[in-house]
């Protein structure tokens, strides 16, 4: 239908219809029949006016386009097709100069010969039904109604048809042609059935009696009755004279609306300072797995058993030593903690029966690393009332950090494919109704695109770690429990695989409130040398713990194996959300689904199959300094998933604030791109609100950098 409209109607009419739909928040790609109806109505209004002039004697004459008498006065003033502000301005001007009564609703034309407003109707139904609806809505003697149908019928107030027979015949012929063209393309039935009646719901609710008196009493100042207020609201333009409206509201409010032009926005200012550091709860692209395929050992599925089995697959252990110290920590304690883990795992192996869980000995190094006895003593406030200089302790402002390239690399890596399958088909949920056949198909296509994705690995890793940590926090509150960091996947051939990333040691965890913190020490394997990007690993103490033999195209090579150790903390509420990271799959699937829906409504059939199977088509993925990046539909799926996963991994107040505030600026820029002529006040205040969220969070800084790329290319 959209293609038909663009071919059938004058481009100026199409542009006006697009503008009208955008003004009312309607999507022409979805509401295609409405798009066609608006274009038809606009064209009939213009045809009604065409060639009709008033001569010097005040008589109505018809003049063809090539006639030299172009200085004659147009008989009709066209109101339809203007934006609401301008349309009401024209109506008010006509009323002031002619003395005509102001209509309650915007009419389509004004007839200078008959001195009356005209409402034009074009209907796919019976003309008399549509006429009655219009008359019931307008409820005005002063607006003349003229209805045309696609079958050649017409109806007008008091059978006064205003125009000569030839002009009306031209309109009827055009409508009949549009109908024939639609029918030839199989569009007419859908178009005919889609017409809705005029909205008259408010007219049916007459307010009487006590409610009417209350309504009249509760009006804003300067309004004598409800009718006056209604008329004012109907004529009120949300985009017009906001300054005046604000100043009426309050003496303190003073806002000047500035036009928002292509040259108005400036880039968001990113902070200067040392580079930002890695702050996720576990390693992402730098993680290394010790894996076993087709596990069938005794106790398979018990984390500690699986961990010991994975540890046995590696033979390159060596005496550990520190290669990158933590600047503020007691680094020997981190080294001793790892040695203690190795020793206690060895002790377990020497036992006849391996226990299901392992509680670590409460050594001095672990007490230090887990902050045991470090919390300040809590004192009841009532016991402190008499202390004269009681005050909240001073806390330092967080140090500003600059964007670093590692976070973009992390994101790129999260979008990539791995050689393992991380989710089974049912991770997103089973069907619950027969109507979900299309939903199943979409889910299966989507799952196929993301099941190998590294972001999906992060989801399963996050779910496992948070579930294990929350369980241990509740079941062993006083113990320093050793928790293996494990994930499960399948190889391309379908063989099961169990992976060990490292270990967590949990501190004391008497978690009464959702926000109470449990400390933990994480120890994670990696092949990444921390000395290459030391700023990324500011919070870590990194040990070299072994040498790993790797097969490559040129044969075997030995690489040092590192252990990234750090103290960290989390809370019940954070673990609860971490356990639900599978929601990221659902969120990104819904985003893809809205893209499919938009495409399907244009083509007027379900486009799921074509959407996923047309490998030649590319889609916009995001903005970069080079411009709009495009890729396959699979790449779009994986990018959307990675964004959702990173929003979960790097969740923070800074991200919440930046997302909420930058969205406002985004909406204004989009309005500018849609030629809606937006206006703003206190744009500086909005920039301030955005930039106060840019402190030190790597994911927020990267999003701000992307936003700047978007601004650059959107406003060219």
Curated annotation (Swiss-Prot):
GO cellular component: host cell cytoplasm; host cell nucleus
Residues binding Mn(2+) 2: 80, 108
GO molecular function, one term: RNA binding
Nuclear localization signal 2 (NLS2) (motif): residue ranges: 184-247
UniProt keyword list: Cap snatching, Endonuclease, Eukaryotic host gene expression shutoff by virus, Eukaryotic host transcription shutoff by virus, Host cytoplasm, Host gene expression shutoff by virus, Host nucleus, Host-virus interaction, Hydrolase, Inhibition of host RNA polymerase II by virus, Manganese, Metal-binding, Nuclease, Phosphoprotein
Matches recorded under Pfam families: Flu_PA
Cofactor note text: Binds 2 manganese ions per subunit.
A GO biological-process term: viral RNA genome replication
Annotated compartments: Host cytoplasm; Host nucleus
Gene3D superfamilies: Influenza RNA-dependent RNA polymerase subunit PA, endonuclease domain
Main location: host cell
Function text: Plays an essential role in viral RNA transcription and replication by forming the heterotrimeric polymerase complex together with PB1 and PB2 subunits. The complex transcribes viral mRNAs by using a unique mechanism called cap-snatching. It consists in the hijacking and cleavage of host capped pre-mRNAs. These short capped RNAs are then used as primers for viral mRNAs. The PB2 subunit is responsible for the binding of the 5' cap of cellular pre-mRNAs which are subsequently cleaved after 10-13 nucleotides by the PA subunit that carries the endonuclease activity.
Summary of subunit composition and partner proteins: Influenza RNA polymerase is composed of three subunits: PB1, PB2 and PA. Interacts (via C-terminus) with PB1 (via N-terminus).
Name assigned to this protein: Polymerase acidic protein
Species name: Influenza A virus (strain A/Udorn/307/1972 H3N2)
């Amino acid at each position: 239908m959209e293609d038909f409209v663009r071919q059938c109607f004058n481009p100026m009419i199409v542009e006006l219809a697009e503008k009208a739909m955008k003004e009312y928040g309607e999507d022409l790609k979805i509401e295609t029949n409405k798009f066609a109806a608006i274009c038809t109505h606009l064209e009939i209004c213009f045809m009604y006016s065409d060639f009709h002039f008033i001569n010097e004697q005040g008589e109505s004459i018809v003049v063809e386009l090539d006639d030299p008498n172009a200085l004659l006065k147009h008989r009709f003033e066209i109101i339809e097709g203007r934006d609401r502000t301008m349309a009401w301005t024209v109506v008010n001007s006509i009323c002031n100069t002619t003395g005509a009564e102001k209509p309650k609703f915007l009419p389509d034309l004004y007839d200078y010969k008959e001195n009356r407003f005209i409402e034009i109707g074009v209907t796919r139904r019976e003309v008399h039904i549509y006429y009655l609806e219009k008359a019931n809505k307008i409820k005005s003697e002063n607006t003349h109604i003229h209805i045309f149908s696609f079958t050649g019928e017409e109806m007008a107030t008091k059978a006064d048809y205003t125009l000569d027979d030839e002009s009306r015949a031209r309109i009827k012929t055009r409508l009949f042609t549009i109908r024939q063209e639609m029918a030839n393309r199989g569009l007419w039935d859908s178009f005919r059935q889609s017409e809705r009646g005029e909205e008259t719901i408010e007219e049916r609710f007459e307010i009487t009696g006590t409610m009417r008196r209350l309504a009249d009493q509760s009006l804003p100042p300067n309004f004598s009755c409800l009718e006056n207020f209604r008329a004012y609201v109907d004529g009120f333009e949300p985009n017009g004279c906001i300054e005046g409206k604000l100043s009426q509201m309050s003496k303190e409010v003073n806002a000047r609306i500035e036009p928002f032009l292509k040259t108005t926005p400036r880039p968001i200012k990113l902070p200067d300072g040392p580079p930002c550091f890695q702050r996720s709860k576990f390693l992402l692209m730098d993680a290394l797995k010790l894996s076993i395929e087709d596990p069938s050992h005794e106790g398979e599925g018990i984390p500690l058993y699986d961990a010991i089995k994975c540890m046995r697959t590696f033979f390159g252990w060596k005496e550990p030593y520190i290669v990158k110290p933590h600047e503020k920590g007691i680094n020997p304690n981190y080294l001793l903690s790892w040695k203690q883990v190795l020793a206690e795992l060895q002790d377990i192996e020497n036992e006849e029966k391996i226990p299901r869980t392992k509680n670590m000995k409460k050594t001095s190094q672990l007490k230090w690393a887990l902050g045991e006895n470090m919390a300040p003593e809590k004192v009841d406030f009532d016991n402190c009332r008499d202390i004269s200089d009681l005050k909240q302790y001073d806390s330092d402002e967080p140090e500003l950090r600059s964007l670093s390239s590692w976070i973009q690399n992390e994101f790129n890596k999260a979008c990539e494919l791995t050689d393992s399958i991380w989710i089974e088909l049912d991770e997103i949920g089973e069907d619950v109704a027969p109507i979900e056949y299309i939903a199943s198909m979409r889910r299966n296509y989507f799952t196929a695109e993301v099941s190998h994705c590294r972001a999906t690995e992060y989801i399963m890793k996050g779910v496992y770690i948070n579930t294990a940590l929350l369980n241990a926090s509740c079941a062993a509150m006083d113990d320093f429990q050793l928790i293996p960091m494990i994930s499960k996947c399948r190889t391309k051939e379908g063989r099961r695989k169990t992976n060990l990333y490292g270990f967590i040691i949990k501190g004391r965890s008497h978690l009464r409130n959702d926000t109470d913190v449990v400390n933990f020490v994480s120890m994670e394997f990696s092949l990444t040398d921390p000395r290459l990007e030391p700023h990324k690993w500011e919070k870590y103490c990194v040990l070299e713990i072994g040498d790993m033999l790797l097969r490559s195209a040129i044969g075997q090579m030995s690489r040092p194996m590192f252990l990234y150790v750090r103290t960290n903390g989390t809370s019940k509420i954070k673990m609860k959300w971490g356990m639900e990271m599978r929601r990221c799959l659902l969120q990104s699937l819904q985003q893809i689904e809205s893209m499919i829906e938009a495409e399907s409504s244009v083509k007027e059939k379900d486009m799921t199959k074509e959407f996923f199977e047309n490998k030649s088509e590319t889609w916009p993925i995001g903005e970069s300094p080079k411009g709009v990046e495009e890729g396959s539909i699979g790449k779009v799926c994986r990018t959307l998933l990675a964004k959702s996963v990173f929003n979960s991994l790097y969740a923070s107040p800074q991200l919440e604030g930046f997302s909420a505030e930058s969205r406002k600026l985004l909406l204004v820029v989009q309005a500018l791109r849609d030629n809606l002529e937006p206006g703003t006040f206190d744009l500086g205040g909005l920039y301030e609100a955005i930039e106060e969220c840019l402190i030190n969070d790597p994911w927020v800084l990267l999003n701000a950098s992307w936003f700047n790329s978007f601004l650059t290319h959107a406003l060219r």
